[in-house]
Amino acid sequence: MKIQFAPHNVPFERRLQTAAVLQWVFSFLALAQTCILLFFVLLFTRFWIISVVYGVWWFLDWDTPSKGGRRGEWLRRHVIWTYMKDYFPITLVKTADLDPQQNYVVGSHPHGVLVAGAFTNFCTEATGFHRLFPGITPYLLMLPLWFRAPFFRDYIMSGGLIPSDKDSASYLLKNKAGGNAVVIAVGGAPESLDARPGAFTLLIKNRKGFVRLAILHGASLVPVFSFGENELFDQVDNPRGSWLRKIQEKLQKMMGVALPLFHARGVFQYSFGLIPYRKPIATIVGKPIRVEENPNPSSEEVDKLHKIYMEELSKLFEEHKTKYNVPADKHLTFV
């Protein structure tokens, strides 16, 4: 394989953008493991008191992630996210107002490999979420296991992430004052196994928990689609039914996280590595779907609203796809 190295005269601004994305990839793939290791290593050094004090704090603070978390605007507004946004670049597009007196369940599609669009738009202020949607506070859901990692849990809570379980989402949606938007990557980790350039396959047909959640609390549903999310990485071929896909699916069920074999570019060369390609992402926020509150929704009611949601998501995709270089004959595939 011929390696294409980056030129020496890359502008300093672009180097900062690459560095910002590098730290994000590291935080996504290895920061939790590093924090766990650090916690235990410190116990066997003269700095053992740090882990002991943190352990006490951790015990007292155990339920915070499921009760709205602990946001840190200093982190959400840090300049590093602006550099990351400009690397791709990433844009947030508003198609309708969101009433700050209402709560929302936002469905984000597709998951992609590393959820770059959803993270940048809803966990940082780099794309101006609060300017576009004043009075709305977004909370991105993440696997609960990551909130059990010392130090790392505080970092992700600062960005506005909360555990992806019913209790955590309900805590926010029960607030009658409104203004909370619970953002769910509906396809979850399994959908990342279908993330590759040109793919528009969404794992949603049997994913109805987010719809039921919206009905339970009378929260409006908002479809969101990020054009370009699946263009960031190549992935080893793993068609459904292949031996590789079967292994990945089995590991996903055992571990709770998917393991897509992805690759893109490196820091100093463009031929291989785990740094995403510089491909634009446009996140389109659709119009809200009004939902009537029902503490005991029937299966038929959930199915009906789920169908409406998929229709609105398809409509959102079709209305905007040509603006983002998606061929006219390409359509969403729901599985």
From Swiss-Prot:
It is a multi-pass membrane protein. The chain crosses the membrane at residues 24-44, 47-67. One of its GO terms (biological process) is glycerol metabolic process. GO terms for cellular component: endoplasmic reticulum membrane; perinuclear endoplasmic reticulum membrane. It is an enzyme of class 2 (transferase). GO terms for molecular function: 2-acylglycerol O-acyltransferase activity; diacylglycerol O-acyltransferase activity. Its main location: endoplasmic reticulum. Pfam families: DAGAT (PF03982). It catalyses: a 2-acylglycerol + an acyl-CoA = a 1,2-diacylglycerol + CoA; a 2-acylglycerol + an acyl-CoA = a 1,2-diacyl-sn-glycerol + CoA; a 2-acylglycerol + an acyl-CoA = a 2,3-diacyl-sn-glycerol + CoA; a 1-acylglycerol + an acyl-CoA = a 1,2-diacylglycerol + CoA. It is found in: Endoplasmic reticulum membrane; Cytoplasm, Perinuclear region. The keyword Transcription does not apply. Pathway: Glycerolipid metabolism; triacylglycerol biosynthesis. The keyword Membrane applies. Keywords: Acyltransferase, Cytoplasm, Endoplasmic reticulum, Glycerol metabolism, Lipid biosynthesis, Lipid metabolism, Membrane, Transferase, Transmembrane, Transmembrane helix. Its EC number is 2.3.1.20, 2.3.1.22. Belongs to the diacylglycerol acyltransferase family. PANTHER family: 2-ACYLGLYCEROL O-ACYLTRANSFERASE 2 (PTHR12317:SF74), DIACYLGLYCEROL O-ACYLTRANSFERASE (PTHR12317). Catalyzes the formation of diacylglycerol from 2-monoacylglycerol and fatty acyl-CoA. Involved in glycerolipid synthesis and lipid metabolism. Catalyzes the formation of diacylglycerol, the precursor of triacylglycerol, by transferring the acyl chain of a fatty acyl-CoA to a monoacylglycerol. Plays a central role in absorption of dietary fat in the small intestine by catalyzing the resynthesis of triacylglycerol in enterocytes. Has a preference toward monoacylglycerols containing unsaturated fatty acids in an order of C18:3 > C18:2 > C18:1 > C18:0 at sn-2. This is 2-acylglycerol O-acyltransferase 2-A.
